[in-house]
């Protein structure tokens, strides 16, 4: 079948799609066979009714089948958020990724330019001098030599060009906000995944379990798709097929609670300058929330036994200059292509 209309009708009637039907529908979308109106109707019908675990698994299957892959070490991790939380914070996961890389854990970071915010990972890294226009071989070399490689989503998921304009015109969250973190081109099995709403914490952990992930935390922190320092973070931790739920507070990281305003960012240039300032030694709320996310990532990757050890390793990555060196090497290797 190469017609999306039957699937639009089914979802509009509030029927759930099987994994097979969901994959077929997204294959149609990603092949370019659906019109913008059909895509918009399908995405919003899913959004209003609520996407199911099976629909997300099927959609991810379609995305992964068409993506441009990257080779990364078995122990690589991704630190990624769905975006779409509307909070306008700094690029928290970007700085956390550099801290983790500086601590010796390879990071295969998947991200994009901002869609619904002022600055995505790609915007900040580009402003810092990282070359985003590189192929899989160079990205693999970045991971090997800098400890961090950035996979620009639009280059690895070229089929997304068929939905990009519709997503921008809709201007609201869709299933694609959920799919990006689940379709890492390096096939990482360890991830810290932030989601834009608390109701997605458990379902995305189930999706990642069904997709074969090994060690994952899916988190939501009081309106943020990150572990937050503003209050309570809900966590679904997947380890070897078992999902455990718990909550975290800033005190669990030895940190003070802060206001959301302290975490507000700006455009790519603004956020890049703030990130560089932390690497240069600034101690502020942006540093602290990134340390917390890095500490959790080091636990997920098995480098730290608990959050206290994770925080110590993360702080050492900054104080020793490890995180700063990771960025410098990433800039150098990416531009040597």
Swiss-Prot record:
InterPro entries: Anthranilate_Pribosyl_Tfrase (IPR005940), Glycosyl_Trfase_fam3 (IPR000312), Glycosyl_Trfase_fam3_N_dom (IPR017459), Glycosyl_Trfase_fam3_N_dom_sf (IPR036320), Nuc_phospho_transferase (IPR035902). One of its GO terms (cellular component) is cytosol. Coiled coil: none annotated. 5-phospho-alpha-D-ribose 1-diphosphate binds at residues 81, 84-85, 89, 91-94, 109-117, 121. Its cofactor is Mg(2+). Anthranilate 1 binds at residues 81, 112. HAMAP family: TrpD (MF_00211). This is Anthranilate phosphoribosyltransferase. It comes from Rhizobium meliloti (strain 1021).
